[in-house]
Amino acid sequence: NTRKVVAWAKKKGVSVEAEIGAIAGIEDFVSVEEKDAHLTNPERALAFVKATKCDALAIAVGTLHGAFKFKGETVLDYDRIAAIKKLVRMPLVLHGASGISPELVERAKSQCSILGDCARLENAHGVSDEAIRKAVARGINKINIDSDLRIAFTAGVRETLMNDKKAFDPRKILGPARALMTEVVKHKMELFGSAGKA
């Protein structure tokens, strides 16, 4: 129960991010089908925040967990974000917001015949930069982009192993992956408006 977690965490000086609504996709081996997903109701969000006293609230406004989000354009409910922000007046979190860079997907898919099956990346498509900008403008404060970092890491490791078949030093294998992830993080910090704010 979220209320119990918040009470315990506050005693330890730890903040709690809670989630209301259900986001489709797979996260931490838990799968939610699109038919079972539901968007966050603003009034229920307010009641939830009052009841739990959480520090940040992750809301469901149309994103999906994982690398396979949309068949076409990103469709987020910006009015819902603004309505929730107006009521709860706390940091709002957007889960499942990876952009899934086509360039990095292609790099991760390179040499799939040797390093593994990448057919599942064929349909990878994420949340557009423009959609993120609009979500931030409406009140989103924290944005989760795990799939972007996984794809960058995978691309960096695969490229290194393909270019140097004798590589066995983890520092030389992981270094390029870390560098690609760093580039993604730099771009996202600019996009989110968080660059230079420590």
Question: Which residues does each PLM region occupy?
Answer:
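Alpha/beta enzyme core
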Residues: 1-94, 99-133, 137, 159, ...
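C-terminal alpha-helical cap/extension of soluble enzyme domains
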Residues: 112-118, 127-198
